[in-house]
């Protein structure tokens, strides 16, 4: 389910919210500069509260354009559509797996990875929302959810592990469109816009730290597997 929903919203490419889900995203007004803001969360809005907690977003903040905005909005759509059909534990898992697909994140100042930090937030939400949780069950749940989340995140960026240059380029070429909205206008963008997009891609790939591409948690995948993917 997380794989199906994690790219439902892509504001830059779509020029806003997709029409089929626009009614589910009324909590995000635009500032005059076009940025999106998370409104105050109603106490009875379980789906939005869960997404904000898992993504560590706060009411009133501007959603970060390149650090989880589209993943967060996609998670909100998923949570609102699925909340009446999934258990709380499964809903937490879906939102957490979508959060894990935010790419290219470094360790924080304390040396914690994105999956380490996500695990703490998942554990907190599971303990708060699942009344019969006991410590051993909670840790087993967290380990499974974050391992699954890391697996999904790694599949999402699997093109970076291709050893064949042609396969690598065909897999990563989509990033040019994703990070350069003008190119979404087929036949309209200029040569200058195309050149700028190519140069951005060159700079991005040249500066990307391989250690920030693939994720792991609780030795899944193993250190050796991650090293092989990043080689």
Each language-model region and where it sits:
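Divalent metal-dependent phosphate-bond-processing catalytic cores, especially two-metal-ion Mg2+/Mn2+ enzymes
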Residues: 5, 9-16, 20-21, 79-91, ...
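N-terminal, non-catalytic alpha-helical interaction modules of very large eukaryotic scaffold proteins
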Residues: 58-61, 73
């Amino acid at each position: 389910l997380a794989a199906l929903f994690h790219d439902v919203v892509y504001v830059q490419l779509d020029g806003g919210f997709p029409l089929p889900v626009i009614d589910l995203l009324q909590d995000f007004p635009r500032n005059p500069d076009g940025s999106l803001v998370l409104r105050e969360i109603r106490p009875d809005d379980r789906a939005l509260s869960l997404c904000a907690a898992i993504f560590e977003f706060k009411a009133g903040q501007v959603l970060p354009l390149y650090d989880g905005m589209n993943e967060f909005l996609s998670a909100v759509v998923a949570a609102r559509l699925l909340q009446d059909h999934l258990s709380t534990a499964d809903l937490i898992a879906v939102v957490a797996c979508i959060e894990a697909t935010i790419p290219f994140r470094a360790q924080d100042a304390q040396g914690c990875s994105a999956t380490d930090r996500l695990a703490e937030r998942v554990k907190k939400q599971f303990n708060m929302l699942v009344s019969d949780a006991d410590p051993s069950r909670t840790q087993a749940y967290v380990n499974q959810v974050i391992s699954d989340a890391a697996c999904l995140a790694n599949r999402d960026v699997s093109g970076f592990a291709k050893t064949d240059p042609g396969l690598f380029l065909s897999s990563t070429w989509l990033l040019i469109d994703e990070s350069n909205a003008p190119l979404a206008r087929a036949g309209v963008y200029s040569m200058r816009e195309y050149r700028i997009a190519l140069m951005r891609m060159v700079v991005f790939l040249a500066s990307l730290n391989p250690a920030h591409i693939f994720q792991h948690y609780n030795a899944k995948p193993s250190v050796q597997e991650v090293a092989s993917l990043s080689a």
